[in-house]
């Protein structure tokens, strides 16, 4: 009934949402080292490469990391859960607040006015030297050359304004140069100004608790919150009774069956 009768719904999606589409979470350090031996040799962890420091000091490796991720996302497809969310949004006023940068919600056909990619998107670029606060779309695959043996990139994309090197339009670790997406931010603020009937928290982790705190705030103001996560400990912050210990894809398929079939 919560889903079927919902008038205003907020989806709070994190890494666990896209994991079923073969998008790595990089939480498993051993798995990360296995996938990228050259990074292990230099002791470059994922958060080291996802930083402005890497783009200034380890540029070939930094762009290789993101080029690999762009190609991986391009080779995979949004899973059934994304389609189900889009179908639900045809029945209610909905919005997606995602910490994911893989662009899968938009690839699945999500309305561009109904999403805030709060950490940015790997499918947009901005100037590494911040010659302007503008950003631009670039969905080219490949975007630059990539040597998978050495995990070094070359022929980097350039800024369309000053011809310097471009970087992903993503909020990285230790990043004071991310230009943000004001339009998406305004759309989210406008949505959240009115009461929300149901918030669904998906695949969040304690490492990036952005969505957890939004869910907690909404729950304290009377919004029903469903938490979908394979990790039972993920419910410690929100502590909702509506906890579903399942993968994101499987949970949405089951919830859709219960609500509408």
Region spans (language model):
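Conserved catalytic core of sirtuin-type NAD+-dependent deacylases
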Residues: 1-261
């Amino acid at each position: 009934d919560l889903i079927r009768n919902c008038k205003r719904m907020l989806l709070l999606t994190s890494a666990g949402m896209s994991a079923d589409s073969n998008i790595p979470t990089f939480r498993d350090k051993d798995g990360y080292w296995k996938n990228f031996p050259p990074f292990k040799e230099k002791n470059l962890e994922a958060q080291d490469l996802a930083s402005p420091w890497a783009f200034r000091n380890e540029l070939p490796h930094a762009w290789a990391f993101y080029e690999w991720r762009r190609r991986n996302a391009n080779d995979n497809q949004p899973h059934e859960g994304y389609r189900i969310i889009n179908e639900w949004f045809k029945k209610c006023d909905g919005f997606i607040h995602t910490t994911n940068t893989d662009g899968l919600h938009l690839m699945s056909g999500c309305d561009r006015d109904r999403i805030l990619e709060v950490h940015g998107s790997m499918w947009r670029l901005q100037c590494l030297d911040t010659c302007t606060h503008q950003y631009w779309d670039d969905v080219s695959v490949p975007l630059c050359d990539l040597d998978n043996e050495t995990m070094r990139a070359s022929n980097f994309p350039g800024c369309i304004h000053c011809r310097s090197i471009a970087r992903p339009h993503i909020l990285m670790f230790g990043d004071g140069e991310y230009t943000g997406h004001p339009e998406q931010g305004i759309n989210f603020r406008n949505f959240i100004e009115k009461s929300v009937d149901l918030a669904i928290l998906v695949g969040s982790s304690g490492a990036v608790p952005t969505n957890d705190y939004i869910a907690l705030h909404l729950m304290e103001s009377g919004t029903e919150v469903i938490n979908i996560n394979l990790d039972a400990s993920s419910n410690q912050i929100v502590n909702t009774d509506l906890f579903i210990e399942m993968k994101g894809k499987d949970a949405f398929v089951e919830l859709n069956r219960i609500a509408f079939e």
